[in-house]
Structure formats: structure tokens, C-alpha cells
Amino acid sequence: MEGLNLVATALAVGLGAIGPGVGIGIIVSGAVQAIGRNPEIENRVVTYMFIGIAFTEALAIFGLVIAFLIGFGVLQ
């Protein structure tokens, strides 16, 4: 049963990181395009970009918390 907990932990971390990774890539790509088209709004775009990255990265942190809960046997 310990082996299945390790597999579940690995899946929680791995799959929990795919979505935020893609999301952050899309956010940064959009920010770079926006700054390239209109360099005067760089400060505002960068601020919104970091806010978006923080919210997106929270999803990966939730996946990591779930993985810890599975790994330590709190969730089964």
C-alpha cells in the first residue's frame, strides 16, 4: 500500500504542475506581446503579469499540499 501512496504523491505533484506551467507560459507570452506592441504600458503590464503568475502558481502549491497530505497518510 505504501507504493500506491508514492505513486499518488508523484501524480499529484506532476499533474498539479502541468496546468500552472502552461498557464504561466501563456501569461508571460501575452505580456511580452503587449509590451512589444505598446512599450509605454510596460509597468502596468508587468504588474498584472506578476499578479496573474501568483494566482496561477497557487494552483501548483495546492497540488504540492495535496501531495504532502497523501505522502504523510492524512489522505488515503
UniProtKB/Swiss-Prot annotation:
What is the topology of this protein in the membrane according to its UniProt annotation?
Multi-pass membrane protein
Transmembrane residue ranges = 7-27, 50-70
What does the entry list under GO cellular component?
Answer: plasma membrane; proton-transporting ATP synthase complex; proton-transporting two-sector ATPase complex, proton-transporting domain
Q: Which GO BP annotation is one of this protein's?
A: proton motive force-driven ATP synthesis
Coarsely, its chief localization is membrane
**Where is it localised?**
Cell membrane
**Per the database entry, which stretches of residues form a coiled coil?**
none
Briefly, what is this protein's role?
Answer: F(1)F(0) ATP synthase produces ATP from ADP in the presence of a proton or sodium gradient. F-type ATPases consist of two structural domains, F(1) containing the extramembraneous catalytic core and F(0) containing the membrane proton channel, linked together by a central stalk and a peripheral stalk. During catalysis, ATP synthesis in the catalytic domain of F(1) is coupled via a rotary mechanism of the central stalk subunits to proton translocation.
Q: Which HAMAP family match?
A: ATP_synth_c_bact
Q: Subunit info?
A: F-type ATPases have 2 components, F(1) - the catalytic core - and F(0) - the membrane proton channel. F(1) has five subunits: alpha(3), beta(3), gamma(1), delta(1), epsilon(1). F(0) has four main subunits: a(1), b(1), b'(1) and c(10-14). The alpha and beta chains form an alternating ring which encloses part of the gamma chain. F(1) is attached to F(0) by a central stalk formed by the gamma and epsilon chains, while a peripheral stalk is formed by the delta, b and b' chains.
Similarity comment: Belongs to the ATPase C chain family.
Q: What is this protein called?
A: ATP synthase subunit c
The organism is Chloroflexus aurantiacus (strain ATCC 29366 / DSM 635 / J-10-fl)
The organism's lineage is: Bacteria, Bacillati, Chloroflexota, Chloroflexia, Chloroflexales
Q: Which gene encodes it?
A: atpE
